């Protein structure tokens, strides 16, 4: 099974939105048994929390339900378990590489990339909408 992890800072805005969008795409393609999708944050200060209410509302307008998702921090094991880790911005990439246990070859499996490498028409980084109201634009970028 191919494993894909979306990562942002707190795992309450961008990465849960990306997780829900990708899960819908995987389900629509009938590939639920081939592709596993999850999300996490580079910081743990929202660990166990629901996504931000504004993310929930934005996703709902697009037919997605984020209410069952819970924030979790990136773990060392993620680098061994996931095939691809897609970060929302350059700071997330840097934080991920700081968390990767480089001395242990088991944790070298995951490839870390910025999500917008796959959609360069949107620039380099998906902005964090937490401090401003860019939730619809962020949804569009990720989708």
Segment roles from a protein language model:
Residues 1-81:
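Conserved active-site segments centered on acidic
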Residues 2-5, 26-27, 69, 79, ...:
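Generic ordered-secondary-structure signal
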Residues 8, 59, 86-87, 142:
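Hydrophobic structural packing positions in well-ordered secondary structure
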Residues 15, 89-90:
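Helix N-cap/beta->alpha junction signal
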Residues 84, 90-143:
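Phosphate-binding/catalytic loops
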